[in-house]
Amino acid sequence: MDDKKAGAGVSAEKQKALAAALSQIEKQFGKGSIMRLGDGEVEKDIQVVSTGSLGLDIALGVGGLPRGRVVEIYGPESSGKTTLTLQVVAEMQKLGGTCAFIDAEHALDVSYANKLGVNVGDLLISQPDTGEQALEITDALVRSGSIDLIVIDSVAALVPKAEIEGEMGDSLPGLQARLMSQALRKLTGTIKRTNCLVIFINQIRMKIGVMFGSPETTTGGNALKFYASVRLDIRRIGSIKKGDDVIGNETKVKVVKNKVSPPFREAFFDILYGQGISRQGEIIDLGVDAKIVEKSGAWYSYNGDKIGQGKDNAREYLRENPDIADEIENKVRAALGVVAMNPTAAATPVAVED
């Protein structure tokens, strides 16, 4: 009995000491600097924005890319990296969000972005001269609390000032990696507080002399690999032809890292030239997988009605009948447990004081 009383006394003392410590922390660093997970003040449901690809939203496990996080999208040249990010920009703008594009490569095609559904009139764009300038602009935009999505295209083009001002053959090892490491240390906390999604596009390089394992690596050192909540590996796996003409690419995206859901899932979709990700093509493929759309030979049917012979004709039918496309998509979402996007999901501005 005495032991129980003693235990209760120690427990009460501990609780009192903890309450005093929490009070001191809040007094020194502000309310909300520390809290219990069960208090309700901590965000339990992850806010997301769609990638523009239903299959990729499903592969990500939460219905899209998580807000308030860092995301890395990498792959070989012409694999669809910029197309995918511009689709995310278009989806964020549909939700009423404000987006910025840091074009370090100085290669953004405005007319192509417009074709993908991006409202280019409202898109903020910066074409910085140095890597430091690009990351300072990113930091200022994140701290404003008024930006919902920032795209940096690309990490490989974030050239340190010392390299630009130096001679062509100068050896400056690790300079870009140190720049990225310092920037991400500074940015990550602010990104979380302002609920801003920051997407880094990255390129692939080959490591020399690798005998075992993949010789591929991404630029900018290892910091981004650690700080990114989601890493997507995008690859072109084939061509889409109409007769003898190539009209698009068959694309595979692998979720290499995912801190908000199980990783290593894959998504397959078509990217059509001048149109972006083929929503209708994905609805057909996922509809067949979920047994919502029937396929018999080359014919596709829905509710007993034939919708086209061959995927191209079925895709065209859904493009001409958007109501049926929406109906099939909603059934696919329900079957796979992926909810539709919330139209009021844009963040409330939260400025961060220096």
UniProtKB/Swiss-Prot annotation:
Pfam families: RecA (PF00154), RecA_C (PF21096). The keyword ATP-binding applies. It is found in: Cytoplasm. It comes from the Bacteria. ATP binds at residues 75-82. CDD domains: RecA. PROSITE patterns: RECA_1, RECA_2, RECA_3. Its main location: cytoplasm. Belongs to the RecA family. Can catalyze the hydrolysis of ATP in the presence of single-stranded DNA, the ATP-dependent uptake of single-stranded DNA by duplex DNA, and the ATP-dependent hybridization of homologous single-stranded DNAs. It interacts with LexA causing its activation and leading to its autocatalytic cleavage. This is Protein RecA.
